[in-house]
Amino acid sequence: MLITKISPAVKTEGRYNVFVDGKYSFSLDEVQLAALTIKKGDELDEQQLDQLKSESSFGKNYIRALDLVSRRPRSQREIRDYAFRKQWTKANTDRVIERLLERGYLNDAKFAEIFVRSRANLRNYSTRRMKLELQKKGISSDIIDQVLSESDDFDENVALKNLIAKKQNRYDDEQKLIAYLARQGFNYDSIRMALNQQKSGTIDDE
């Protein structure tokens, strides 16, 4: 088999289409093209062609992963879940994850810090819910515990008081409010204490 043509892709800047025996076979980005040193006129056997096609798939997968992490921080689990849905090969998925880690685009500890900060400021999450949400994202228990213990942004008592102030008018029955707060992951004793402070006018006192 012979590489008969290498030409710039029309729709994707920086990517090149490679033709084998006169037919389109695969595409590579300019970095891959330079690294692999392939050129028009090169002869390929089946194994070499398969390897080049695998590199093509890896390059596309990596660019897609870069696009995902550029939109917002991602955990390793999120990238793996996306790769599974899109049916990437395990080998390519592992390579993509490894390269993202090497280049600092994936960091579960930083992801957890940003997640905690955003939920603390906007969502009034309980510690329990914060942990559950981070676990769903694939963050290890050690990282979760460390981030929560070191965070200056997260205070469960403040989150609980804020949520009471926000939701109290919606629940004219205190027991329903307590049940709602419990479903959000706050424990009964903390809920009772916060409600008693609110009734006595000390909800903002520390």
Feature map (PLM): residue ranges:
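An alpha-helical, amphipathic repeat domain used for nucleic-acid recognition
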Residues: 1-206
